[in-house]
């Protein structure tokens, strides 16, 4: 996989032929010398320990680990919470709140042994029982956790625990969360999880931010509001929230009660301030003024003038495992015909989008599962039937017009006006404006609905849109993480795609046999792309500005910034 990154990056890990090897790209580490962006304060050995300020998103939709599905929320969650296991800076699974773990010979029983002396940020004790509570809370349909099936679906008795959900994810029987086969020992020292089928990447799942524990006392005392105020926000990671001004900033302070897998001797900054900015111009100004030492939202019109890190600059472009796609609301009559969906897809010049609109910071997509995702022998993208979308745009456009006519809409006649919903950040609005023109060439009228980030994602999840920009960054390196999104009833299936053959292929992939696992996932992707259940647009890169003064942080192939060890040099 092509990577444009800084000097001290971790290279793509070797691909293993072992079942679900989960090799992945390593992330970018922080660079050299020193200047602005720190909080005034003490220094020790050339290290400013007071703190630093960054921007990687606006107001988070939620910081409840069970409810979050956005990358900006996850970036904060991995700093203030800690799951059973962690992914370290070398992309290795290491102990988090669990000091060790073991798996039975049949691969079904996972036993985690907790560290001694674990504490919540309020100083109260934490043990395996808190994880049992948190996982059973997540499986409860009343929690409405979008990742419940992805994270817990392989655990024994999941279906009963979730109330035997139907194709839309709604329970068909009384849910029984306590039935989920997750059990803490009486002394809280061990957590035993029994799976319904072997899942060799379950250690990576146990390191996923969504699998972080939440404190039962504060959740039950404060309801959904528990995670909206520092007064009620209890966490267990190396930092905790001490100040939160919506639309302005969140201040994280070093957690004095932290016990866990991160090296406490490397957690040196007293505070990390997160600027909650949605306007990329404001983010850029914060960086140029020295207020922030890292900003993710860079104005796209500034990119041509920026100097890349490998050329001695402070602009970084780093490949991540994910796909930018467009969701069609398949519950709308306008999109029920696969010929229409294919026409809309074929009318998009993806090379123009990636290289002109997105200025080469993304790569044109020809499938939903992109490069870098491993297969039994190599990469899934290379071993499958991609490209599903030809690079010959002129031929594609002619085919699009033909399909639209076959669907009963010659030159778009009789087709309803449709609306494209997006938040206004990065390339989202320029892409929407391009789609207006591209689909206009088919005779289709597209309007644009620009929304605030905090309201956009709930509306998309609720199906309150016609067409919406979407995307997915992988949580672990297996194609199932991307393809599972499109299962009937999946909480992240925003387009409400549903095909029994696709679901059957996904179900058949949940086996210990590696060859069969990947064969069924290839079959599932074939079905999804033949249906054009979503419109793949581009493969993700992250791009950001970072001052050379910021040390100790790293960027992962899953789009996360790890700030735990961050500090300002000088």
Give names to the regions the model predicted.
Residues 113, 132, 139, 143-217, ...:
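Surface-exposed binding/hinge segments that line
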Residues 88, 253-259, 320-343, 347, ...:
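A bilobed periplasmic-binding-protein/Venus flytrap-type ligand-binding module shared by bacterial periplasmic
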Residues 239, 363-406, 425-429:
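Structural transition elements
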Residues 55-105, 234:
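N-terminal lobe/hinge region of extracytoplasmic solute-binding protein
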Residues 208, 224, 257-305, 445:
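Ligand-site clamp/hinge motif
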Residues 88, 92, 167, 177, ...:
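Gly/Pro-rich hinge or "lid" segments in bacterial periplasmic/extracellular proteins
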Residues 99-153, 192, 334-336:
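Aromatic- and charge-enriched surface segment that lines or borders ligand/interaction sites
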Residues 15, 245, 347-380, 426-436, ...:
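Detector for C-terminal structural segments
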């Amino acid at each position: 996989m092509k990577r444009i990154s800084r000097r001290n990056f971790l290279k793509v890990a070797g691909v293993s032929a072992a079942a679900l090897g989960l090799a992945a790209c390593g992330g970018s580490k922080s660079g050299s010398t020193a200047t602005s962006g720190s909080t005034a304060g003490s220094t020790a050995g050339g290290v400013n320990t007071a703190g630093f300020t960054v921007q990687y998103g606006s107001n988070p939709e939620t910081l409840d680990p069970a409810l979050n599905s956005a990358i900006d929320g996850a970036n904060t969650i991995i700093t203030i919470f800690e799951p059973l296991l962690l992914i370290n800076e070398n992309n290795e699974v290491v102990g988090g709140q669990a000091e060790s773990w073991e798996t039975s010979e049949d691969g079904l029983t996972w036993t985690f042994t907790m560290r001694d002396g674990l504490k919540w940020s309020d100083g109260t004790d934490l043990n395996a029982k808190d994880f049992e509570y948190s996982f059973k809370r997540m499986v409860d349909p009343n929690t409405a956790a979008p990742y419940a099936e992805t994270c817990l679906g392989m655990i024994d008795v999941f279906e009963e625990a979730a109330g035997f959900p139907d194709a839309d994810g709604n329970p068909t029987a009384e849910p029984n969360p306590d039935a989920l086969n997750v059990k803490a020992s009486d002394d809280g020292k061990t957590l035993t999880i029994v799976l319904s089928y072997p899942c060799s990447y379950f250690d990576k799942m146990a390191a996923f931010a969504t699998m972080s524990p939440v404190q039962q006392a504060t959740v039950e005392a404060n309801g959904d509001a528990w995670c909206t105020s520092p007064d009620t926000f209890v966490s267990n990671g190396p930092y905790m929230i001490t100040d939160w001004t919506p639309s302005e900033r969140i201040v994280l302070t070093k957690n004095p009660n932290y016990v866990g897998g991160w090296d406490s001797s490397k957690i040196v900054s007293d505070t990390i301030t997160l600027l909650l900015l949605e306007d990329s111009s404001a983010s850029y100004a914060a960086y140029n003024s020295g207020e922030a030492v890292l900003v993710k939202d860079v104005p796209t019109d500034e990119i041509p003038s920026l100097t890349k890190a490998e050329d001695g600059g402070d602009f970084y472009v780093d490949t991540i495992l994910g796909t930018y796609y467009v969701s069609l609301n398949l519950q709308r009559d306008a999109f029920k015909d696969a010929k229409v969906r294919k026409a809309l897809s074929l009318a998009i010049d993806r090379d123009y989008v990636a290289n002109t609109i997105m200025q080469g910071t993304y790569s044109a997509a020809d499938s939903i599962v992109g490069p870098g995702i491993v297969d039994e022998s190599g990469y899934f993208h290379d071993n499958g039937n991609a490209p599903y979308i030809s690079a010959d745009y002129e031929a594609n456009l002619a085919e699009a017009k033909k399909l639209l006519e076959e669907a009963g809409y010659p030159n778009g006649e009789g087709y309803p006006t449709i609306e494209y919903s997006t938040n206004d950040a990065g390339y989202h609005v320029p892409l929407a404006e391009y789609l207006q023109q591209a689909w206009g060439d088919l005779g289709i009228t597209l309007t644009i609905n620009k929304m605030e980030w905090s309201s956009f994602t709930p509306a998309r999840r609720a199906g309150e849109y016609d067409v919406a920009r979407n995307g997915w960054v992988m949580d672990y390196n297996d194609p199932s993480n991307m393809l599972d999104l499109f299962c009937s009833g999946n909480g992240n299936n925003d387009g409400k795609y549903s095909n029994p053959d696709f679901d059957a292929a996904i179900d058949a992939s949940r086996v210990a046999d590696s060859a069969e696992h990947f064969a069924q996932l290839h079959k599932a992707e074939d079905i999804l792309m033949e249906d054009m259940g979503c419109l793949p647009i581009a493969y993700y890169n992250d791009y950001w500005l970072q001052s050379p003064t910021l040390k100790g942080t790293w960027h992962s192939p899953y789009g996360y910034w790890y700030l735990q060890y961050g500090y300002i040099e000088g």
